[in-house]
Amino acid sequence: MNESESEIQARLLAQALPFMQRYENKTIVVKYGGHAMGNPELGKAFASDIALLKQSGVNPIVVHGGGPQIGAMLTKMGIESKFEGGLRVTDQKTVEIVEMVLAGSINKEIVALINQTGEWAIGLCGKDGNMVFAEKARKTIKDPDSNIERVLDLGFVGEVVEVDRTLLDLLARSEMIPVIAPVAPGRDGATYNINADTFAGAIAGALNATRLLFLTDVPGVLDKKGQLIKELSVAEAHALIADGTISGGMIPKVETCIDAIKAGVQGVVILNGKTAHSVLLEIFTEHGIGTLIVP
């Protein structure tokens, strides 16, 4: 006999129950970015996932990026994007626009989407409650001809040096869902633009989060046959980087996962944000849909 839609929904909810119990009162940090942010239907599905996590007793925290939107705004305002070693240079004028786009328009759009579900989201950035302090990023690049390393001056691109969890702990005890933009102050009074992945990792590490989810445009880490690897230890991840299985843009993503685990996160997942309800499919099903990296 074919199941009715209501019977299927009931069965799926019953299967999800043990996972709801497993993650009750646990912190899950979700880095939201990639294609999902530009798709209205995926955006609504993401917001409903976050709302359901909260309703299930989970403490969800959203960290978001916004690279394409920043680029579009800079173009609109006639400001040329400059790059050093493939990394965006953020001068004073640019960092003001970065803050406007990240902590302003994008942040509030995500907050509004979650609030439309009936939950209560609040938009923040690293400046709020002195949550995050940063310092100027120190990046180097090796000249392929001379093999000499030189230091890149990326302007107001920062790295997290301190996370104060006080505000986030207060919010965890409330009904509110934090949505955080990766902008933070330095002790020097400057404002810094921080890579959203590393920012999310720092937040998750400071909170000893049970899970950190990276929503990307790919299914996860793939083996040399192109098949999804469901779970990796840190040691196995290092080995796959060394033998070239993990390559290109996936290397910094996996390295960020490893750093987050070293900082205290219990498990980090790279998953496909282009799949509707990807967060629920990862958290509330037995095998998840991405690659789980564990200590």
UniProtKB/Swiss-Prot annotation:
Gene3D superfamilies: Acetylglutamate kinase-like (3.40.1160.10). Keywords: Amino-acid biosynthesis, Arginine biosynthesis, ATP-binding, Cytoplasm, Kinase, Nucleotide-binding, Transferase. One of its GO terms (cellular component) is cytoplasm. SUPFAM superfamilies: Carbamate kinase-like. It holds the Pfam family AA_kinase. The lineage of its organism: Bacteria, Pseudomonadati, Pseudomonadota, Alphaproteobacteria, Hyphomicrobiales. Its EC number is 2.7.2.8. Substrate binds at G66, G67, R88, N193. It is found in: Cytoplasm. Catalyzes the ATP-dependent phosphorylation of N-acetyl-L-glutamate. Transmembrane segments: none annotated. The record marks K31, K253 as: Transition state stabilizer. The keyword tRNA-binding does not apply. GO terms for molecular function: acetylglutamate kinase activity; ATP binding. Pathway: Amino-acid biosynthesis; L-arginine biosynthesis; N(2)-acetyl-L-ornithine from L-glutamate: step 2/4. It catalyses: N-acetyl-L-glutamate + ATP = N-acetyl-L-glutamyl 5-phosphate + ADP. GO terms for biological process: arginine biosynthetic process via ornithine; L-arginine biosynthetic process. Belongs to the acetylglutamate kinase family. ArgB subfamily. This is Acetylglutamate kinase.
